[in-house]
Every structure is written in structure tokens, then in C-alpha cells.
A protein has these predicted regions:
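Acidic, divalent-metal-coordinating active-site segment for phosphoryl/phosphodiester hydrolysis
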Residues: 642-644
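Active-site beta->alpha loop and helix N-cap motifs at the rims of alpha/beta catalytic domains
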Residues: 10-13, 63-194, 342, 355-366, ...
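N-terminal amphipathic alpha-helix/helix-capping segment at the start of soluble metabolic enzymes
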Residues: 1-39, 154-160, 296-354, 359-363, ...
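Catalytic alpha/beta core domains of metabolic enzymes, predominantly
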Residues: 134-150, 154-155, 176-325, 431-438, ...
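N-terminal glycine-rich anion-binding loops that anchor highly charged ligand groups
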Residues: 23-38, 43-62, 66, 71-74, ...
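Short helix-loop-beta junction
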Residues: 61, 371-375, 622-630
């Protein structure tokens, strides 16, 4: 079993990371305060009127902290006029000066703003892309040089009562860090901690840290490693979360939701910014959508509705995870055959979606299957398995009629059918589905429950059909509920019992899925428990029912993206009321953001700021219009040299 430093209190149960409170002007950050929402202006900082107008627009949208770039002394000095005009208009939002390359601008900005952001990769270093082997003495000399450049800012911020963000960017690590640690999360963390240690030597502690990357996986790993390293060193500074250069549209929101939401799920993060290549005001509703469920827990910590499902009612040790939170490794699983589709093992994570009309409506169901399985344009991704729901004998008759019509419609997509095990148990022959999805009767005593499972599994095995056990808290059988309660642990023990019974009757193609609201904790516990029992059954990761586009986009991305970045999941399903095209697009955008399946061109574009000397939004649109056909290609569209050569 891998022994790694802990990055959070408990991977199976939400508890916010404890931090000190750092005040950004009148806005307290960290501790038990809500997750703060912030953004950054894209106007020219020398254009006072435009920057003031944009700041007011952000504040009216709900932005709590506004960052403004100060690339030179001129912009740093103009922050005084911007702040004065905002105060004249009754706007007291905290301002943050964004500094790269120019310590003199940071020293001037400290006189006017509530926080200064510096990048440890370029505050005292210039990027030369030089390869050099540093001895320990040479490296120490470099740290002393950096301290000499950085100390004046630390002392001035301390004198003025101004906070600092030490913000590492994956794309702008110094040559010194790159040569010793490489382009890695470890390098990102050490880059920041070097500056934190200097601050602490001068008894300055109003510090916020960030570990931004355009790749959500790298960003997640870096923040986790930072949390673990800081815990080891007795540091408790709050974190600013964000995926840099996330892009625009749905893709940018999905990347941000996965990166930021994965960390918030573990209680990590105190302020967030959703970086979009759009007008800055569009970032605010996206940020609130991500933060809302976590701030709701903070607002009502003792209310049952605000708490996740209990992990366990027992004092027994919880299972040890085999996943490495600081590096990606997909959970090993058996490969199963579902009709013509292979799932698990080395197969790509598959996309399964459900129809939303009753099965009795054969015409409507057929139309939805066609919409889900037919590419919108040549080469476009499609749903790889369509999920149907049957609750009665009449539904099974409708399913048989539907099957007869598929060849004439030119449809061959594998179908999965969800039905009660009692209904399956009563059938003389199985429906012609690639996979049957069911759960046994939880009210049966242990012996009859085992017999029902064995009969159903044996029937499935004889017909060569795949089997998925789908579990909710209500499906935990009473004899297991007595031991484990209606808990995540109860779900995991129910799943392992079902898989073991299937092995007894030699069912080769078995999967497990869960349908419970704390999806991340539940699937993590399930995977850890199954692995501890030597059961490499594939996992179908699905969301609970999500209604409306906002919930599907943000909550679906957070839950599924977190699990996929943890290496969990062999197929995925968003349970939503989205139209077919939108559900397919969102599913593949999640897979692409998690770096698991590339289905289109990957655009990495920064959100623009006062440094940008051209219209980044229209430029991005123009490049996309000409290059979106280049599947498997990554294209970076950058507004300046901060995160690029």
C-alpha cells in the first residue's frame, strides 16, 4: 500500500481545511468564512474610466475582490486614481495588483491596494530557458539573491497592512526551479514555499497561495501537494483556486469546474476565480455556481440537509485507498463485454446516456436513441451505450417492439435496460439488451436475498448479457443495514457481496454503479473497499439526477471530473434533462478536460488583462473557426509572455 502525506482530513467525508484568516481590505478570507469570488479586469489599466467601469460591473455582479494588472510603474501609480474614483462612487471593493517581472511596480502598488499578487517564477528571475546543474551551495546562493530582491516588498506590505498572494503558474516556473524539480507539481509547490519561508523570516503572514495550471490534473495535484507540504511544515495559509487559460464557453467552464470543484470537494480552497476568455463579468455567475454547494454547507453546518451522507456508523478502520492523489493512475479493472462494446481494463472511459421519455413511447424512444447515437457531423462523438428504463411487463413488450425497429432505422448502438430484479427473476427469457441494470429487493432476509441474486446472475450468465448492479441507500439490504447503517460503507459492502455472489455463479461481465448525492466520497470508498477485497470490477460513474443546464454543467463536471482525475470510472453517465446533443457534448468535454479522451481540438487561451495588446476574444474566435477540425492538437492562444516564451 502506498504511504503518502495526507492532503485533506478525510477523502471520504467533507471537512474544510483549517486556515488562518487573511483580511483583504474589509473582506476576511479563509477560516470559517465563505469561499470568496473574485475576477480580474481586462481593460487597459492606464484607462482609468474603463477600469473603473469594469470594476463596478464586476461588483454589481457579486465579485468580492477585483484584480488589476500593473505591468510597470505607470500602471502601478495609476491604481491610485482608479481607487480614488471608485471610492468617490461609493465602491470599496478590495483591489489586487497583479505583478510579473517588476518588483518596483509591486512596491509602488502596495501603497494603493489591499493585496499584491506576485509570481515566484518571474519576480526575481528572467526566463532564459537555460539548462544548468545547481550545486547545493549555488542553489542556496540563488535563494539569498531572491531574498534580497523580495525582502523590500515583504517589509512594505507588512508596514502598510497589505496582503500578498504568492501565485505559482505552471507555465512560468523559473529556470532554477525547472532545472532542479522539472515542470512538475513538486516544482510548483517548492517555487511558492521558497517565498513563503522568506516572508516568515520577517514575521509576515498575510499570505494567500495559488498553484495554477491550464491542465486541471496538474493543478489538482499541485494544490494537494501544497496542502500536504504546508501541513508538514505547520503552515496554515489560505488558498486561491483557479485553472489558468481555461478558455471560453462550455469547455472553459468544464475545466474550471473540474479543477476548482475537485479541490473544494476535499475542503481545499478559500477564494476562487474562473478564468474565461470572455468579458470578465461572465466569470462571476460561473464562480458562484461552483462555490454554491460548499458555501451552503458552511452557512448551515449543523443542519442535516447541508451534510453529506454518513460514511460509517462504526469505529472500525476505514479502507486504505490505492490511488495516488499526487499523480494520475487509472484504477485497474477487469475488461467486460457489453454486446459489441468493451468496457474497463485498458479500454477508454465510455459514454452512456439515458433516454428521457417513457419506454412505452416507442416512437419517442427511437427518436432519442437516434439523436444520441448518430453523429451531429462526420467524426463527431456519440453516445456509446443508450440506457432505457423498464418497470413493468408492458415496458418489456415495448422494448421488444423497439428492438424490432432498430435495424430498419439503421441503429446498432448497444442498449442497456434498467429493471427491478424481481421483474427479471420472473422472466422466462431475457430482453435483448447488451447490459441489464438492476438491484435486489432490500426487504428480503439474507438467505432469500442471496438466492434472488444468484438466480438473476445465473440467468444473465446463461444468455451472455452484461450485468450492472446499481445501488442507492434505499437498496442496502436490511441485514447489512443492521451492521453498517444507511451509509457509504453500507453501499460498499452491498456491492462487494453482490460481486462475490456473481463470481460464485461465474458471471463474467459485471459492473457496479452508485446513485447517491455525495458521489465523490461514495465512489472513492467503494473503490477502496472493492480493491481491498481483490475485486477489480469496473465502475460506471454516474451523477444523481441533475435538472437544468447549470446543474448538469457545473455539478456534473465536478462530480464526474473529480472521480476521473482520481483514476476512477470505466464508463460515465450524466443523469440530466439536457437535450441529446448537449449531453453528448458535455460528457466528452468532461473526458477531454480530465485528459482521458480527446474528441476535438484543445484550445488553451488566457482570459486577457491589461497586458494584452490585441482583442483576445475575437482573435480566439477567429483561430477556433479555422482550426477546430484539428482533433488531438493543442493550440495555445496567449495574450502576453507571462505563461509562454
Amino acid at each position: 500500500m502506498i504511504t503518502l502525506p495526507a492532503y485533506c482530513h478525510d477523502p471520504f467525508s467533507y471537512r474544510r481545511r483549517k486556515t488562518r484568516v487573511v483580511s483583504i481590505g474589509d473582506v476576511p478570507l479563509g477560516g470559517d468564512y465563505p469561499i470568496r469570488i473574485q475576477s480580474m479586469t481586462i481593460s487597459d489599466t492606464m484607462d482609468t474610466a474603463a477600469t473603473v467601469a469594469e470594476t463596478i460591473q464586476l461588483v454589481e455582479a457579486g465579485c468580492e475582490i477585483v484584480r488589476i494588472t500593473a505591468p510597470s510603474l505607470n500602471e502601478a501609480e495609476n491604481l491610485r486614481h482608479i481607487k480614488a474614483e471608485l471610492h468617490r462612487r461609493g465602491i470599496r471593493v478590495p483591489l489586487v495588483a497583479d505583478i510579473h517581472f517588476t518588483p518596483n511596480a509591486a512596491l509602488k502598488a502596495a501603497e494603493y491596494v489591499e493585496k499584491v499578487r506576485i509570481n515566484p517564477g518571474n519576480y526575481a528571475d528572467k526566463k532564459k530557458f537555460a539548462t544548468r546543474e545547481y550545486s547545493d551551495n549555488e542553489y542556496q546562493a540563488e535563494l539569498e539573491r531572491i531574498e534580497a530582491r523580495f525582502k523590500p516588498l515583504v517589509l512594505k506590505l507588512k508596514q502598510y497592512g497589505v496582503a500578498m498572494r504568492i501565485g505559482t503558474n505552471h507555465g512560468s516556473l523559473s529556470d532554477r526551479i525547472m532545472n532542479r524539480f522539472g515542470d512538475t507539481p513538486e516544482g510548483m509547490v517548492e517555487s511558492a514555499l521558497e517565498f513563503v519561508r522568506i516572508c516568515e523570516r520577517y514575521d509576515y503572514h498575510d499570505i494567500v497561495l495559488s498553484m495554477k495550471a491550464s491542465n486541471p490534473l496538474v493543478m489538482i495535484q499541485a494544490y494537494r501537494l501544497l496542502a500536504a507540504r504546508m501541513a508538514e511544515e505547520g503552515m496554515d495559509y489560505p488558498f486561491h483556486l483557479g485553472v489558468t487559460e481555461a478558455g471560453d464557453g462550455e469547455e472553459g467552464r468544464v475545466k474550471s469546474a473540474i479543477g476548482i470543484g475537485s479541490l473544494l470537494e476535499d475542503g481545499i480552497g478559500d477564494t476562487i476565480r474562473v478564468s474565461l476568455t470572455e468579458d470578465s463579468v461572465h466569470e462571476i455567475p460561473a464562480a458562484y455556481a461552483i462555490a454554491k454547494p460548499y458555501n451552503a454547507r458552511l452557512a448551515a453546518p449543523n443542519q442535516k440537509a447541508s451534510l453529506p451522507v454518513c460514511v460509517s456508523t462504526r469505529t472500525a478502520p476505514l479502507p486504505q485507498e490505492s490511488r495516488n492523489p499526487y499523480g494520475y493512475r487509472r484504477r485497474p479493472s477487469d475488461e467486460v463485454r457489453l454486446g459489441d462494446l468493451q468496457v474497463g481494463g485498458a479500454q477508454p472511459v465510455r459514454v452512456e446516456l439515458a433516454t428521457t421519455v417513457p419506454l412505452a413511447d416507442v416512437d419517442g424512444t427511437l427518436a432519442q436513441i437516434q439523436a444520441l447515437s448518430t453523429p451531429a457531423q462526420p467524426g463527431a462523438p456519440v453516445c456509446e451505450m443508450v440506457r432505457l428504463q423498464a418497470t413493468s411487463g408492458a415496458d418489456l413488450e415495448a422494448f421488444a417492439r423497439l428492438r424490432q425497429r432498430l435495424p430498419a432505422a439503421g441503429l446498432s448502438v448497444p442498449l442497456s435496460l434498467c429493471l427491478p430484479l424481481a421483474l427479471l427473476d420472473s422472466l422466462p427469457t431475457l430482453p435483448e439488451a447488451a447490459k441489464l441494470i438492476t438491484a435486489p429487493d432490500p426487504l428480503l432476509p439474507e438467505g432469500p436475498w442471496h438466492e434472488q441474486v444468484r438466480r438473476g446472475a445465473a440467468l444473465v450468465a446463461r444468455h451472455g448479457v452484461g450485468l450492472e448492479w446499481t445501488l442507492r441507500l434505499e437498496t442496502i439490504p436490511h441485514f447489512l443495514r443492521a451492521a453498517y447503517g444507511a451509509t457509504i460503507e453500507g453501499l460498499a459492502y452491498t456491492a462487494s457481496r453482490l460481486v462475490e455472489l456473481c463470481r460464485e455463479v461465474a458471471v463474467p461481465d459485471v459492473m457496479v454503479s452508485l446513485d447517491t448525492a455525495p458521489a465523490v466520497a461514495a465512489y472513492r470508498f467503494l473503490a477502496a473497499h472493492l480493491d481491498s477485497q481483490g475485486l477489480a470490477v469496473p465502475l460506471h460513474v454516474k451523477t444523481p439526477a441533475l435538472r437544468g443546464r447549470t446543474a448538469a454543467l457545473f455539478q456534473g463536471s465536478i462530480w464526474l471530473g473529480t472521480l476521473l482525475c482520481d483514476g476512477l470510472g470505466d464508463s460515465l453517465q450524466i443523469d440530466s434533462d439536457l437535450p441529446a446533443a448537449e449531453a453528448i457534448s458535455l460528457s466528452y468535454n468532461i473526458l477531454q478536460a480530465a485528459r482521458l479522451r480527446m474528441s476535438k481540438t484543445e484550445f488553451i487561451s488566457c482570459p486577457s488583462c491589461g497586458r494584452t495588446l490585441f482583442n483576445l476574444q475575437t482573435t480566439t474566435e477567429r483561430i477556433k473557426s479555422r482550426m477546430s477540425h484539428l482533433k488531438d492538437v493543442k493550440i495555445a492562444i496567449m495574450g502576453c509572455i507571462v505563461n509562454g516564451p
